[in-house]
């Protein structure tokens, strides 16, 4: 629940509405404020704070959570992942068998893995019996790919739980691949800026590798089929898709399906527009292809994966929902926050930017609920910055403020699943870099997965608030969300609550737990940048300890810092953290 708190920043806005602040029982909370003043000094360690902000620190924020009933319940796979088809182009698909990559992906399971992106509609499936012959003879790619195949055959480690194919790739081989990927990155960027894309061939062998990665990692694969293959009458040409469906069914691959990616852009990408009504008919056609295939007769189908809901996009969604609203299991759209070519580090701290998503959610919900009230809605392919992201920004600690706020806002407004673009690929919006090292948003996602359950709780705060002048709105720089603690986390009994807090202020903030949370033990998971780069750092520390993998097969233990019962929470400036309130015995959290 997004909340207003002490001395937020006033910013001009002509179109924004004031964010809601829930504070029932204000008299009760005011009494608690009076009784709790003696505990303000719970943490006396000096922190670097501007002298001008000294008065702000005297404000104590009282926080309570409604524990009787959840306000929302989202999907168990709420935080999910995406892989872009560009990994075929740059060669990284052949390295999905990496033990380190599989370990990192397993850390974020259970989740969906969407295989889709801008190159979805240029993807063609070929069931080649001998892929080596299709490579055109010896060359750098030939030797690199066959070297990888040899390693997989000779050095496969069979996972004891699944019997997965997992490989240890030699350093020299990874270095060759990085050089190739760096060259291809320039090609991919050129395609993206010119909006002209070359065709991609997905072989049966490549599909095997993709599915092996998803299955070994505990991820459910969602495959986005090419929707731009069109017949002369503009109906969908399903021949390539049918070949892929038959092959995957023969392998008994458990896959869900989509058709296309951002159909609102087809005119500029392909010179041929597809309206919402036609796209709806195409989805019905895809459903008719799936039903006779025994393993896919009840497979889930998602779409239409539209872009930002501008007027023309809303019109496309409206036409789609009229025809195929009941055909899809969830309605999907995409969101990008910033133009990656002009982004600055301070952009990630702007409350106006954090709030742009809320209006889009309402627009999508309005159309969906008109035709299929209660239909699940997913945000697919969310990225912080466009154009592949910006080095040292999109992959830095600073980008985490947008990502964590996105997770909190979406769950609070009833979006069922959010799919992060991307787990691993070219560019800088990913969770894992090309050295297979987890970036700050990965660690943030890992903490979220470990601590946050699907039940969303209402947050109530009390504290001094400044009234906005006419024509202006106060935007909150302290954001607090609450969920039931993940019931799969055996370190905490059912009934515990997890708060996650974003402090965008340049001063620390003090929060006193009240009501049902009062005098409970708290475990702190404070995530801060590590190193001299500050907000631009690509490394993070948890409660003062840097987070790094133990080895290729082992993630580090996420150790909390216990806080004594009744202690005031002190949130350092420009940081984010998770706080597990133990043994609350919250009724909303006792049962699944």
UniProtKB/Swiss-Prot annotation:
Residues 1-41 form the signal peptide. The keyword Signal applies. InterPro entries: Glyco_hydro_79 (IPR005199), Glycoside_hydrolase_SF (IPR017853). One of its GO terms (cellular component) is extracellular space. Glycans are attached at residues 254, 392. Keywords: Extracellular matrix, Glycoprotein, Secreted, Signal. Pfam families: Glyco_hydro_79n. Widely expressed, with the highest expression in brain, mammary gland, prostate, small intestine, testis and uterus. In the central nervous system, expressed in the spinal cord, caudate nucleus, thalamus, substantia nigra, medulla oblongata, putamen and pons. In the urinary bladder, expressed in longitudinal and circular layers of detrusor muscle. Found both in normal and cancer tissues. Gene3D superfamilies: Glycosidases (3.20.20.80). GO terms for biological process: cell population proliferation; extracellular matrix organization; positive regulation of cell population proliferation. It comes from the Eukaryota. GO terms for molecular function: heparan sulfate proteoglycan binding; heparanase activity. It is found in: Secreted, Extracellular space, Extracellular matrix. Interacts with HPSE. Interacts with SDC1 (via glycan chains). Binds heparin and heparan sulfate with high affinity, but lacks heparanase activity. Inhibits HPSE, possibly by competing for its substrates (in vitro). Belongs to the glycosyl hydrolase 79 family. It is linked to Urofacial syndrome 1: A rare autosomal recessive disorder characterized by facial grimacing when attempting to smile and failure of the urinary bladder to void completely despite a lack of anatomical bladder outflow obstruction or overt neurological damage. Affected individuals often have reflux of infected urine from the bladder to the upper renal tract, with a risk of kidney damage and renal failure. This is Inactive heparanase-2. It comes from Homo sapiens.
């Amino acid at each position: 629940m997004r909340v207003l708190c002490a001395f937020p920043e006033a910013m001009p806005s002509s179109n924004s509405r004031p964010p809601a602040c829930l504070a029932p029982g204000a008299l009760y909370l005011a009494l608690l404020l009076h009784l709790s003043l003696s505990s303000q000094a719970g943490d006396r360690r000096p922190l670097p704070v501007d002298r001008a902000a000294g008065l702000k620190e005297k404000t104590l924020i009282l926080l309570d959570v409604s524990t009787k009933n959840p306000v929302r319940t989202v999907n168990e796979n709420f935080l999910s992942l995406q892989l872009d088809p560009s990994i075929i182009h740059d060669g990284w698909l052949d390295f999905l068998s990496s033990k380190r990559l599989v370990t990192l992906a397993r850390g974020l399971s259970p989740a969906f893995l969407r295989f889709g992106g801008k190159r979805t509609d240029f993807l063609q499936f070929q069931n080649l019996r001998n892929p080596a012959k299709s490579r055109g003879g010896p060359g750098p790619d030939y030797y690199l790919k066959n070297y990888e195949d040899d390693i997989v055959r000779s050095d496969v480690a069979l996972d004891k739980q699944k019997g997965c194919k997992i490989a240890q790739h030699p350093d020299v081989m990874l270095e060759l691949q990085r050089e190739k990927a760096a060259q291809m990155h320039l090609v991919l960027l050129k395609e993206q800026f010119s909006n002209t894309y070359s065709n991609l061939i997905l072989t049966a062998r490549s599909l095997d590798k993709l599915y092996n990665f998803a299955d070994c990692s505990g991820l459910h694969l969602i495959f986005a089929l090419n929707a731009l293959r069109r017949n002369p009458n503009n109906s969908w040409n399903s021949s390539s898709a049918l070949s892929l469906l038959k092959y995957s069914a023969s392998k008994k691959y458990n896959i869900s399906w989509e058709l296309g990616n951002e159909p609102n852009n087809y005119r500029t990408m392909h010179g041929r527009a597809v309206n919402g009504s036609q796209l709806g008919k195409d989805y019905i056609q895809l459903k008719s292809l799936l039903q006779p295939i025994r393993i896919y007769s009840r497979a889930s189908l998602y779409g239409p994966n539209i872009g930002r809901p501008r007027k023309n996009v809303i019109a496309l969604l409206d036409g789609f929902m009229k025809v195929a609203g009941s055909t899809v299991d969830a309605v999907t759209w995409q969101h990008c926050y910033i133009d990656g070519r002009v982004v600055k580090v301070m952009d990630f701290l702007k409350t106006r930017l954090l709030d742009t998503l809320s209006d889009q959610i309402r627009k999508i919900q309005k159309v969906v609920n008109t035709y299929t009230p209660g239909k699940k809605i997913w945000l697919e392919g969310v990225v912080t910055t466009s154009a592949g992201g910006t080095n040292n920004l999109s992959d830095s600690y600073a980008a985490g403020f947008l990502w964590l706020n996105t997770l909190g806002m979406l769950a609070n407004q009833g979006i069922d699943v959010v799919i992060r673009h991307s787990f691993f690929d070219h560019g800088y919006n990913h969770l894992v870099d090309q050295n297979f090292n987890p970036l700050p948003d990965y660690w943030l996602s890992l903490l979220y997965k470990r601590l946050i359950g699907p039940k969303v709780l209402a947050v109530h705060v009390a504290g001094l608030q400044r009234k906005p002048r006419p024509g202006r709105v106060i935007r909150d720089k302290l954001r607090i969300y609450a969920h039931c603690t993940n019931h799969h986390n055996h370190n905490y009994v059912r009934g515990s609550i997890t708060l996650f807090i974003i402090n965008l202020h340049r001063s620390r903030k003090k929060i006193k737990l009240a009501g049902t949370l009062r005098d409970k033990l708290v475990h702190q998971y404070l995530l801060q940048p590590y190193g001299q780069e500050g907000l631009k750092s690509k490394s993070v520390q948890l409660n003062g300890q840097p987070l790094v993998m133990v080895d290729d097969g082992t993630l580090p233990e996420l150790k909390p810092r216990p806080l004594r019962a009744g202690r005031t929470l002190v949130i350092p400036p420009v940081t984010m953290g998770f706080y597990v309130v133990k043994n609350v015995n919250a009724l909303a959290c006792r049962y699944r």
